[in-house]
Amino acid sequence: MLSKRIIPCLDVKDGQVVKGVKFKGHEVVGDILTMAKAYSEAGADELVFYEISASVEKRLLDVNWVESIARHIDIPFCVAGGIKSVADAARVLERGADKISINSPAIARPELIKELHDEFGKQCVVVGIDSFYDEVTGEYLVYQLTGDPNASSRTRYKTQEWVKRVQDLGAGEIVLNCMNQDGVRNGYDIEQLSKIRELCNIPLIASGGAGSMQDFVDVFKQSEVDGALAASVFHKNVINIGELKQFLTNNQVAARL
């Protein structure tokens, strides 16, 4: 059985790690390099960095910090933020990132997924999907530009159809960001993740809602995702990664100790 991945997520803005609630009200929580090194030493399986304002500001993320991270940690890491072309992705990967993730740029130009797949291989290409549950219609809807509350907007896609499309275009992995759960620590959206798992034949990573170690056990056992991404519970030392992995193992969830 493949080990489940524990993935701290670091939202980056102006060279600092920040965190909000439901994609709003971001506050600075620390230095990128300091936090990356700490998570690597604590036993994280990989890291994800989102430069949250890059797509909104129509620019590529700052590749200088990518190079610094690559020199100082020895676990895989994925980078996202304003990657709109093969050339953009190459700049990030050349600086040492293991994977690149695209979100809003893929919605604007879906063929970008195939271009990245063809150039770098499936294993490098992650697609992030920001999914909002509309309580009125009961539908899961894809949003874009969520790094800025003033720019965030609904797209033409429903989540299920976009999941199918990005797979067809060559995505190697999907990170499903459940917007209603983001930062509130009430548990992952297992119902939504289970529905997406049925459609998804590539690795699926859960994001949004982790509040306790039991939440990780539940999401792995009940929705069968491949990894779980979390931010605030790690940034604020609510959960220790080493203790979490031992807890998973004790609850019959495979984890790298």
Swiss-Prot record:
Involved pathway(s): Amino-acid biosynthesis; L-histidine biosynthesis; L-histidine from 5-phospho-alpha-D-ribose 1-diphosphate: step 5/9
MF terms in GO: imidazoleglycerol-phosphate synthase activity; lyase activity
Active-site positions on this chain: D11, D130
EC code: 4.3.2.10
Paired cysteines (S-S): none
One GO term of the biological process aspect: L-histidine biosynthetic process
Subunit structure: Heterodimer of HisH and HisF.
Protein name: Imidazole glycerol phosphate synthase subunit HisF
Taxon lineage: Bacteria, Pseudomonadati, Pseudomonadota, Gammaproteobacteria, Alteromonadales
